[in-house]
Amino acid sequence: MAMFGFPHWQLKSTSTESGVVAPDERLPFAQTAVMGVQHAVAMFGATVLMPILMGLDPNLSILMSGIGTLLFFFITGGRVPSYLGSSAAFVGVVIAATGFNGQGINPNISIALGGIIACGLVYTVIGLVVMKIGTRWIERLMPPVVTGAVVMAIGLNLAPIAVKSVSASAFDSWMAVMTVLCIGLVAVFTRGMIQRLLILVGLIVACLLYGVMTNVLGLGKAVDFTLVSHAAWFGLPHFSTPAFNGQAMMLIAPVAVILVAENLGHLKAVAGMTGRNMDPYMGRAFVGDGLATMLSGSVGGSGVTTYAENIGVMAVTKVYSTLVFVAAAVIAMLLGFSPKFGALIHTIPAAVIGGASIVVFGLIAVAGARIWVQNRVDLSQNGNLIMVAVTLVLGAGDFALTLGGFTLGGIGTATFGAILLNALLSRKLVDVPPPEVVHQEP
């Protein structure tokens, strides 16, 4: 098949249970639509939760995730099976840049959007460079020890935000604990797709419990469904205009480094599952993701990234057809044009969102450790040990550096600190040949 241009998508006659469906193959229309629904559901939990945590409109973010996925599909020539959803990497820096308190709509959303656009631009430029010279320089700049440390630092940096969001009252704190337990029980005691959707299912169960305890038993603030009943079934989401603030852009733009590392890992995972070489499309994937992030930020949506949740669905179903993600994108766009759906999202109690964020932020931190384990990172080397130790404290302590009028927050200092310390302290192990033994004749 040609390196660039769209494949022909040969019809796969076997069922999804008995055979693998390759990226350049397709299922019958009905099965493609059903698989699209499954992928839309898989991305739903995080794509809704992340914009809420940043004070963005989740309805618009869902719409832009669908549009971004279609843009990614066209830029990669329909060769890379991936779904683009709201990225957790933006949460900490957006909150730091805007001073968002975690409740309702972010009043400083405009400067956050300018930063998201700047991040997408940096990401796109990196993709263009990769298209020219390949990815080896990225792997040298950000080896697994660096990416693992930065990802873990992001999770630790977000931890105080999650805890503070559920500390308003004793009832909120206990409901957050109940939410954590709901998600944990789903993760451990369910199987198949329900287990894959642990965040979404856990949120639904926790919301039902919250409704019973407040609306029925009167133990807390009741859930108000007035907005849901008055909202229209179809309509435009709320768009916002970006503002370009230098300090916010400097704070948010470095997230591009995290997105590159994340996308790189996801593409390698997809390549391993499909048996296809994804390296020729890596630069295009970065460009597609970067442009989708810029487009989303330009109208009020969150930054996007390829989703591990959907990679997990592919691993289970063995269906890698890229047309499935077109179906998922169309479904997401339809949901994004439903104000009633958006109003329903806004009824999720803050305590439940806070409990879910405790789990999500913890999983982000653990994902960093998983990178180390999967790549057999040697933390007994002093260079690696010092780099990781400093990076984690910079991120967890939200260490900031100010230069002139610009301030680099904890995630930014952790990211650049990890890259710089790795470059300074890493050393290649050189095999020293054993001394030559000279045998003298007696």
UniProtKB/Swiss-Prot annotation:
One protein family per Pfam: Xan_ur_permease
Q: Which biological process annotations from GO are given for this protein?
A: pyrimidine nucleobase transmembrane transport; uracil catabolic process; uracil import across plasma membrane
Q: Name the source's superkingdom.
A: Bacteria
Q: Keywords in alphabetical order, please.
A: Cell inner membrane, Cell membrane, Membrane, Symport, Transmembrane, Transmembrane helix, Transport
Cytoplasmic side residue ranges read 1-57, 101-110, 162-169, 218-240, 306-318, 369-385, 428-442
User: Membrane side Periplasmic: which residues?
Assistant: 79, 132-140, 191-196, 262-284, 340-347
Alphabetized InterPro entries for the sequence: NCS2, Pyrimidine_permease_RutG_pred, Xan_ur_permease
- Primary location recorded for the protein, binned into one broad class: membrane
Name a GO CC annotation attached to this entry: plasma membrane
Please list every transmembrane segment annotated in the UniProt record, as residue ranges.
58-78, 80-100, 111-131, 141-161, 170-190, 197-217, 241-261, 285-305, 319-339, 348-368, 386-406, 407-427
Q: Where in the cell is it found?
A: Cell inner membrane
Provide the induction entry: Up-regulated by the nitrogen regulatory protein C (NtrC also called GlnG) and repressed by RutR.
Q: What happens when the gene is disrupted?
A: Cells lacking this gene fail to grow on the nucleobase uracil as the sole nitrogen source but use the nucleoside uridine normally.
**How would you describe this protein's topology in the membrane?**
Multi-pass membrane protein
Q: Which GO terms describe its molecular function?
A: pyrimidine nucleobase transmembrane transporter activity; pyrimidine nucleotide transmembrane transporter activity; uracil transmembrane transporter activity; uracil:monoatomic cation symporter activity
Q: What does this protein do?
A: May function as a proton-driven pyrimidine uptake system.
Query: What protein family does this chain belong to?
Result: Belongs to the nucleobase:cation symporter-2 (NCS2) (TC 2.A.40) family.
The extra comment attached to this record reads:
The Rut pathway degrades exogenous pyrimidines as the sole nitrogen source at room temperature but not at 37 degrees Celsius, a restriction that is apparently a consequence of an inadequate ability to remove toxic malonic semialdehyde at the higher temperature (RutE/YdfG function).
User: What is the official name of this protein in its record?
Assistant: Putative pyrimidine permease RutG
Name of the encoding gene: rutG
